[in-house]
Every structure is written in structure tokens, then in C-alpha cells.
Amino acid sequence: MKSNFSKFKDFIKYKKVAVVGIGVSNRPLIKFLVKLGAKVTAFDKKHREKLGSISLELEEIGVDLVLGENYLDKLDGYDVIFKTPSMRIDRPEFVKAKESGAYITSEMEEFIKYCPAKVFGITGSDGKTTTTTLVYEMLKKEGYRTWVGGNIGTPLFANIEEMKEDHMVVLELSSFQLMTMDVSPEISLITNLSPNHLDVHKDFEEYVWAKKNIFKYQSSNNLLVLNKDDDLTNGMENEALGDVLKFSLVEKVYNGAYLSNNKLTMQGKEVCDSKDIKLKGRHNIANLLAAFCMVNKYVSIDSMKYVATNFSGVEHRCEFIREVNGVKYYNDSIASSPSRTLAGLNSFERPVILIAGGYDKKIPFKPLAEGGYDKIKILILMGDTKNKIKSAFEKVISHKKCEIEIVIVNSMEEAVKVADNMAEKGDIITLSPACASFDMYPNFEIRGNEFKNIVNSL
């Protein structure tokens, strides 16, 4: 049972509230808490000069600022602390604050707890953003007032009073956001699971445990959607508290969605033919099947079909940029894990020139090398992980007695220049890093946009 938002308003009024992080996503939260009558202090590692005009803007509405290297040392004495998702709750500063009586939470936890609309939550290692967008588009096509947020879209908590019971909310949720959750969306999906974010999580087991929070607190009338082709997610059916639907690319699933004879089918009803889908790759067929399961109770087959046959993809996901001298360029900057890069490679019909490498999330690259060696013509590596990826491929090349030319570069501009010089007519060049961007870029969007700008200047 959802809690009425008036309870939160009564609870937060006059409270001393700390918000950790003054990034773009937290700014609406800070302003909203001030509007609700809280006494807000915002914390950030950046100094005033780096934050720019937002520091003055927040101070003008009565927000106190704690900035600089040791900013978390001053978390004592607060009633409520909103932490940024990527910060572990077992940090000493949070542990100490909790022992002193602070209620530690996050924007997403409070949003799901109080949101009056029906909430669809999507998580997994790969396919989250595309599937979230597909679910959003299908609900919108059916005529629902639909909101999208979480890891994509805009922060939604500040808009919660505009939402009604007959609205729909679609959330992309990361393991960071889920790690401290004690509330679950009514309709939840885990797309697939493979090692990821092991720079933050203690191990893969903790990562999986965090993902499970998306359904751990559901009720008997809620829905969990699982990938039947993924052993880990398929096995979670026994832990479900409500109904379960599954999707599969390899076998018929009568209580769910499946691909058979190139037809995408939902509970025995044909939705569309795979040849009519604009999205590239089998992984995107899986994303569509997952979306069908999520919206099945709320959306007609016609709306599913319309989106499946008209939606051409999300920016930075196997996005075609242009063709230059017979060479096609694709931007797959969202591919921040080996499994996502493998899915991208599998969507092409010939070996490609791959640009990869980036921030080290402490995950293995052996699966990428073993699964992708025959799909790569030339491998161009950059970033913190370049030598780690090179080593993984060299072992597979030696074992398989195959040939892949590997080139190490120091910048995106150099990577594109090398790829352009080495490419022949008919080749495909794709940026699909298999890593996060944080060693060189603030996020994958900026990385992808730089790649596109360089390609468009050729």
C-alpha cells in the first residue's frame, strides 16, 4: 500500500536535512525540500569555483553549503540525510550519522514509497535504457499520462504532487539506487545479469543482491518479469512474491513473450515480425519481449506493434552516425560493460573495427575476448583499461591462433584517426567501449558526443 505524500510533507517540515551531492540530478531535490519547509544543507566535494552559479542560487533560497575535500566530516547533527546513489551506506561518515539517529535515505526510495502512480521499474546489466524507453513509449502510445525517470529523463521527486493514480511512471534503476531500497515497484524487470560495477560493489554476489531489491518488497498482486535465457534471472522465479512473466529468444514461453520463426509473440498472440523492427540486433528483440511482458496488462497488441516497428533506438546505443568513403560509423558509447559490447558486436553481420577502453570498474575482459574475437577485425584501445583489454585478447588470440591487429591510442581523436586510416570500403567502425567513461569524460553521453563530432568532421 502506497503512503500518502502528505505524511512525508509533515515528516520533513522543519527537519535539518543534509543532501549529499549538488549535481544536476540533486538540484531539483534540494529546491523541493526547501519548498516543503526543511532546513537544508547541501554537501559537495567540489569547491565553490567549480560549482559555479548554482552555489549562489542555492544560498539565495536559504540553503547552507558544505564544500571541499573533507565535506563528509560535517554530517553530524542532521535529522535526515539524502545520499547520492553511488555512495555506499557503510561509509564511516554515514554509519556514524545513523548511530547518532539520522534517517538515511535517497530520492528514489522516497519517490517509490510515496508515488501515487503505478511504477514500472527496470534494472539489469544491459538493456535497461532501451527497455525503459520502450515501456515508456508503449504506455504513452496507449494514451496514459506517462513519466520517465531514474537513470534517464529528469528527477521526478519534485513533480510527485502533479502525479495521479491513473498515471504511469517508468524508472530505470541502477544497482547503486537499489542497494539500500526497502520498497519495490509494482511491476519490475531484471533484463539480465553479468559482472558490473565491481569498483563499488564488494563482489558479484553483492551486485546481484542489490538488483534483487527491485522485487524483494513486492506484494502478491505485483509482477516480476525475468529473462528465461539468463540462468541467474531465471532462477529468481522461486523468490518472487507476486506473479511472474518470462521472455525468451530461444524457446516458447506461454506465460510470457518469445521469438519463434522470426515472430515476436506475447502469450500466444503475434505482435510483429522481426524483419519489421527498426532496432538492430537480437539483444534489442529481447528488450522488446521484456517490454511486452511489462505492459501486457495495460497496453494493446496494436500499441506494442506500433512501437516495435517504429522505434529506431536511443542515442548512443548502436547509433548510426554516417558513412564516409564506404565506411559506416556507429556510436555505442552506452556500452559500459563487456556484455553490452558483445551484444553490440553481435548486431553486425561482419567483423568490425572496434574502439574500446575506459574507466576500470574492476570487471574481467576475458568474456569479451572469448566471445568477441571473431567479430573484430581491428581493435583500437584507449583509457585506463587499454592494457587490461589488450592482455585478455592476446591470450585468446594465442589460444585460438587467430589474428586481430591491436592498436593503443591516447585519445578519442587519435582513435578515430587510426580507425579511419586503417578502414577499407565496406568496413564498420564502432565505438563500444566495454567500460565506463569516468577516466576521460564525465559521462557516456559526452564521450559519445565527442566521438560523433569527430566523425562528422571527417
From Swiss-Prot:
Its EC number(s): 6.3.2.9
GO annotation terms (biological process): cell division; cell wall organization; peptidoglycan biosynthetic process; regulation of cell shape
This protein's record includes keyword Transferase: no
GO cellular component annotations of the record: cytoplasm
Pathway where this protein functions: Cell wall biogenesis; peptidoglycan biosynthesis
List of residues binding ATP: 124-130
Coiled-coil stretches noted in the UniProt entry, renumbered to this chain: none
Keyword Cell wall biogenesis/degradation among record annotations: yes
Root EC class: ligase
Catalytic reaction list: UDP-N-acetyl-alpha-D-muramoyl-L-alanine + D-glutamate + ATP = UDP-N-acetyl-alpha-D-muramoyl-L-alanyl-D-glutamate + ADP + phosphate + H(+)
Sorted UniProt keywords: ATP-binding, Cell cycle, Cell division, Cell shape, Cell wall biogenesis/degradation, Cytoplasm, Ligase, Nucleotide-binding, Peptidoglycan synthesis
Function: Cell wall formation. Catalyzes the addition of glutamate to the nucleotide precursor UDP-N-acetylmuramoyl-L-alanine (UMA).
Protein name (record): UDP-N-acetylmuramoylalanine--D-glutamate ligase
Organism: Clostridium botulinum (strain 657 / Type Ba4)
UniProt gene name: murD
